[in-house]
């Protein structure tokens, strides 16, 4: 009888496929078989790229005369630790009775790469048709749909091309420039860090991230605080008093004065005191009064970078730990695919979203969540999701945002406590998009004292809306604006207060009000914050925005450095090779002395490796290959030209 073979990336995923297909046969050595189906699995990567010395024994030694190394026929090999499982997979792929092969690897570029390497090395039965299963979750319905709608493998060839190119690019840049810089500068680095010898590890993405961390640290280290002095006026009427902050205007006697640090602060305290003296006895008039209503929608759904950043802030865990947790939730059928860059869902998913909501209502027993869901249903908040900003097919490439499936609750009680907390964060963000916007009442007020301007405002939340889901405590305090704050100021005066609204209610434009007092407030500039292990992930995702050239920035809009699947591992590697430190309690990221020395070497030898522009443009190129906008050989030619050109320039510098 003809057989159908499914190959998954992990044994646990294979078991889910077996359940869905109702295969009750006993698990054999590395696979499961029924009358119709055979299911086997990889254990992550089974095949890897060969080291240079496999090509030529001379390449075992790091010597200048063997560089640059760019093979024209690439060699691959089975990873020794998983040779047995590869043999099992290979034997199944080559069986004569297998007529259809389903590639059910992880639905992404790296998952495609893992499976394609296996197929390349195993040489499947040429008569068998190979299909690709592409799924967004591991629910029964989604697995059934994935098998039913599996497409011919050839439709994913461009994705596979980009995966091969990504691996080749990282291999060539890592091997050639790690060796070359180590040969040229290794002794100098060893001397600087007081070690007997040192190698320099270079990576397309890793080195750029090191550059971001070191640059931020040096910006902080070299920052010189500047003290300045702000003037706060206290005004009032029979309803009470309010504070307003002075700000220079074109009619002010201080306009363009060298005595000012900025538009609302003096360089010297004595000048501020002198200015206050000049205000004595002058009338205060309300010259502008603006009342407005504001609405604020719930934030977009989580992609991997956003949830990693959120979990670092909330739970002080590293990005790779967050991914591991969400991967477990995914494999337990509780959430959708984790390695996604999208923060929206598709129209098709939105039309069926009631299944997710009904599943939450029936299965998720968290008391607060049930209250929020019941309110949402009774108030009919969940209608017309398709027409909102949370649904956008054009912003989805491989997978939509991370959302709860409404299934998998048979596995929930066995989850570790931290996994439950992360799940709840995902659930709450999901529920929030169905709630109405938060609503605010706001008043902006301008007081003029002769030619001088003082500004104040008041803002209060009048309807919690989605904040009932995401910010149930101290909402008004959290949402209060700090009017006229000076950027990078660590001494901010709150002249925007919800209590001001009570004072403002009877005030009218043109009215004279009483001046109670003027005071001087000390202020000082503050340096930028250090990255933590979550915010550096977001910075990597948005690295394209750091590019100064507007035309290029627009050209590679949306390109980050690394991918959602790899960013956490890159941070982990930088820490492992002791280029950065991550504080276990705060998750604050700082460079080590070794990391800074390596940065200086790279900054001298090949500074473009530290610039997000280069890395983001390479990533954009890989994306263009996947989308069939350029050919794989075009990308490879550019890569080889870059390596040869950069190598020649570095050798001249020796």
Region annotations inferred by a language model:
Residues 1-179, 266, 387, 500, ...:
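Intrinsically disordered, low-complexity regulatory segments
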Residues 2-5, 24, 28, 82, ...:
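Basic, low-complexity terminal or inter-domain segments flanking catalytic cores
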Residues 52, 97-102, 144, 243-269, ...:
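OB-fold/S1-family RNA-binding modules
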Residues 192-201, 213-268, 314, 338, ...:
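C-terminal helical "lid" subdomain and adjoining coupling/linker elements of P-loop NTPases
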Residues 206:
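Conserved PLP-enzyme active-site core in the AAT-like
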Residues 256-300, 308:
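Metal- or metallocofactor-binding catalytic centers and their adjacent structured scaffolds
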Residues 310, 314-318:
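A conserved hydrophobic secondary-structure block that centers on an alpha-helix together
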């Amino acid at each position: 009888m003809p057989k159908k073979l499914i190959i998954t990336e992990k044994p646990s995923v294979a078991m889910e496929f077996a359940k869905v297909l109702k295969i009750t046969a006993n698990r054999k050595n590395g696979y499961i078989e029924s009358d119709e189906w055979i299911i086997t699995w990889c254990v992550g990567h089974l095949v890897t790229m060969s080291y240079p010395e496999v090509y030529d024994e001379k390449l075992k030694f790091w010597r200048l005369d063997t560089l640059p190394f760019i093979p024209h026929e690439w060699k691959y090999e089975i990873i020794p630790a998983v040779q047995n499982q590869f043999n099992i997979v290979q034997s199944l792929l080559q069986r004569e009775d297998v007529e259809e092969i389903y590639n059910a690897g992880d639905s992404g570029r790296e998952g495609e790469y893992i499976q394609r390497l296996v197929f390349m090395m195993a040489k499947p039965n040429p008569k068998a048709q190979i299909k690709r299963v592409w799924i967004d979750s591991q629910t029964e319905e989604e697995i059934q749909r994935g098998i039913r709608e599996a497409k011919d493998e050839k439709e994913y060839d461009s994705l596979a091309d980009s995966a091969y190119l990504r691996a080749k690019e990282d291999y060539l840049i890592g091997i050639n420039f790690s060796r070359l810089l180590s040969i040229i500068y290794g002794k100098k680095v060893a001397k600087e860090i007081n070690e007997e010898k040192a190698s320099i590890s270079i990576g397309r993405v890793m080195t750029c991230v090191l550059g971001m961390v070191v640059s931020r640290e040096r910006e902080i280290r070299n920052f010189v605080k500047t003290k300045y002095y702000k003037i706060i006026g206290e005004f009032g009427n029979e309803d009470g008093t309010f504070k307003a902050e002075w700000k220079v205007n074109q009619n002010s006697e201080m306009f363009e004065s060298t005595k000012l640090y900025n538009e609302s602060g003096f360089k010297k305290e004595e000048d501020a005191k002198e200015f206050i003296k000049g205000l004595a006895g002058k009338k205060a008039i309300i010259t502008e009064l603006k009342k407005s209503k504001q609405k604020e929608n719930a934030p977009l759904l989580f992609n991997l970078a956003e949830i990693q950043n959120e979990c670092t802030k909330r739970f002080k865990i590293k990005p790779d730990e967050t991914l591991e947790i969400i991967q477990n939730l995914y494999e337990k059928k509780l959430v959708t695919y984790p390695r996604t860059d999208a923060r929206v869902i598709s129209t098709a998913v939105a039309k069926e979203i009631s299944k997710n909501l009904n599943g939450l209502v029936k299965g998720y027993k968290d008391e607060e969540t049930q209250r929020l869901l019941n309110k949402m249903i009774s108030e009919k908040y969940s209608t017309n999701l398709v027409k909102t900003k949370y649904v956008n097919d054009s912003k989805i490439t491989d997978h939509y945002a991370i959302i709860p499936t409404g299934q998998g609750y048979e596995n929930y009680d066995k989850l570790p406590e931290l996994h439950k907390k992360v799940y709840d964060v995902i659930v709450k963000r999901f529920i929030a998009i169905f709630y109405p916007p938060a609503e605010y009442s706001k008043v902006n007020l301008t007081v003029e004292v002769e030619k001088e301007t003082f500004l104040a405002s008041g803002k209060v939340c009048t309807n919690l809306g989605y904040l009932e889901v995401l910010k149930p405590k101290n909402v008004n305090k959290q949402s209060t604006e700090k009017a006229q704050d000076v950027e990078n100021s660590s001494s901010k005066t709150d002249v925007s207060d919800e209590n001001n609204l009570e004072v403002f209610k009877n005030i009218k434009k043109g009215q004279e009000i009483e001046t109670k007092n003027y005071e001087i407030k000390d202020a000082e500039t503050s340096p930028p914050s250090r990255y933590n292990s979550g915010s550096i992930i977001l910075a990597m995702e948005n690295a394209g925005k750091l590019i100064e050239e507007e035309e290029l920035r627009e050209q590679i809009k949306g390109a980050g450095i690394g991918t959602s699947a790899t960013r956490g591992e890159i941070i982990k590697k930088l820490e492992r090779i002791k280029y950065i430190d991550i504080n276990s309690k705060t998750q604050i990221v700082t460079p080590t002395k070794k990391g800074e020395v390596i940065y200086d070497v790279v900054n001298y030898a090949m500074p473009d490796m530290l610039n997000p522009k280069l890395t983001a443009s390479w990533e954009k190129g890989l994306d263009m290959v996947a989308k069939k906008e350029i050919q794989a050989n075009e990308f490879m030619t550019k890569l080889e030209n870059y390596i040869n050109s950069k190598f020649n320039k570095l050798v001249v510098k020796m």
